[in-house]
Structures are given as C-alpha cells and as structure tokens.
Amino acid sequence: MEKGQMLYEGKAKKVYTTDQEGIYWVEYKDDATAFNGEKKGTIGDKGIVNNRLSALLFEVLEKTGIPTHFIELLNDREMLVRKLEMIPLEVVVRNIAAGSLAKRLGVAEGLNLSRPVVELYYKDDALGDPFVNESHSLAMGWAEQSDLKEIQELGLKINGELQKILDQAGIILVDFKLEFGKAEGKVYLGDEISPDTCRFWDKETQEKLDKDRFRRDLGKVEEAYAEVYRRVKEVLKD
C-alpha cells in the first residue's frame, strides 16, 4: 500500500490518504499540547508509545466485539485505519473525580465515583471543546439519537474492558476520552487510546502516568508514557 498526500495535521497526528479507498495512513507525532493549545512542547518517543499502545488496545477491543478503525500497525509511528465520518463529540468516561469534573463540582481530586460518569463535549478547539448534553447534540444535528445511545454504551463497555487490562498492569483508569465515527452506517471507535487521552494512575502510589505530568510540569513525562506501554504490553504478551 502506498502513502498518499497529507490530508491534515493535528496536534498529535498526521493523516494521509492511501492508494486504497476508505483507508487512511496515520503518523503519530511527539508534539504535545495542553490547555487547548496554550501550552506546547515535545515528549520524547510519545508518538511511538501512543501508536503502539493504541494498536494493542484496539486489537483487544476488537476481540471483545467493539468495532474500531484500526486496521494494521505499520511501524513504530504509523498505522493504517479505516476512513470514518467523525461524530463531532468527545465521549468522556470518568471513574474517579479529576480534572474538569473535580473543579466543576467542587470535589477533591481522587474521589471514587459510585458509578462511571459519561460526559459529552463538542469538538471545537476555538470554543475550548465545551461540555454539552444529548439535547444540544440533537438540536445542533451533531449526532442522531441512536448514535448518541450507541457511543455512550460503547464508552461504558470500553471502560470495563480497559479496566480489566489496566488493573492487571497495576494502573488505575481514572478517566478517558473517546472519539467515534461512522463508515457505511456503522459506528466505530476512532482516534487513539493513550496517555494523551486517558488519565492513568499507579495503583499503589497514585503517581500520575499520563499527560497531566506535562500539563502540571511534574517531570519524567517520557518515563511515565513508556512505563504504561511496558506494563500493558507485559499483560497482553500472551
């Protein structure tokens, strides 16, 4: 398969066409941003970790019946994915209060939620990806009722599957962001699953193993990313 022209470059990835219809070529970058692009930097080998970790987790989710856009891992930084018509919503699943939820509700970071919370955010960098609900999404035509139901149900199912793996790896899944799209009328999980899109805490020490280390200038960012990948790979090696 041949890599074609670059379609667009995002904050963390470059997406290219291929010579096969319906398939994109994705390259993961080391660039890092936070606070809607206000903070910028580089995390060494982030692209490698995010590419390989996403591939591992997409493969596991596929085996449980969750459709993803993942097709094939090409090398350290690149993969082939299915072309999707993206739903312009982020689905955020939270198991523990942290980040914007803790701030918005005035609760301490680290509070265990009695059940997973599912939130929707409208994908728009200029607006800061605002928190929205189903009524907004339907009224604005961002998604159909059936798709809203499906992506939230998939979010909870993905949460359960990821928690099984991460628990064995000694990692707490605090919260995470998902993006979905459609191809031929079917909903697929898109984007990535990585320390860029998830909050991971060490189960014993509660040490942060994700992009919060970059956001908050905690140091050892590269080491945290690599450690997550190492642990997950070890759990899934069989």
Swiss-Prot record:
Pathway: Purine metabolism; IMP biosynthesis via de novo pathway; 5-amino-1-(5-phospho-D-ribosyl)imidazole-4-carboxamide from 5-amino-1-(5-phospho-D-ribosyl)imidazole-4-carboxylate: step 1/2. GO terms for molecular function: ATP binding; phosphoribosylaminoimidazolesuccinocarboxamide synthase activity. Signal peptide: none annotated. It comes from the Bacteria. It catalyses: 5-amino-1-(5-phospho-D-ribosyl)imidazole-4-carboxylate + L-aspartate + ATP = (2S)-2-[5-amino-1-(5-phospho-beta-D-ribosyl)imidazole-4-carboxamido]succinate + ADP + phosphate + 2 H(+). InterPro entries: SAICAR_synt/ADE2_N, SAICAR_synt_PurC, SAICAR_synth, SAICAR_synthetase, SAICAR_synthetase_CS. GO terms for biological process: 'de novo' IMP biosynthetic process; cobalamin biosynthetic process. Gene3D superfamilies: ATP-grasp fold, B domain, Phosphorylase Kinase, domain 1. It holds the Pfam family SAICAR_synt. Its EC number is 6.3.2.6. It is an enzyme of class 6 (ligase). Keywords: ATP-binding, Ligase, Nucleotide-binding, Purine biosynthesis. Belongs to the SAICAR synthetase family. This is Phosphoribosylaminoimidazole-succinocarboxamide synthase. It comes from Desulfitobacterium hafniense (strain DSM 10664 / DCB-2).
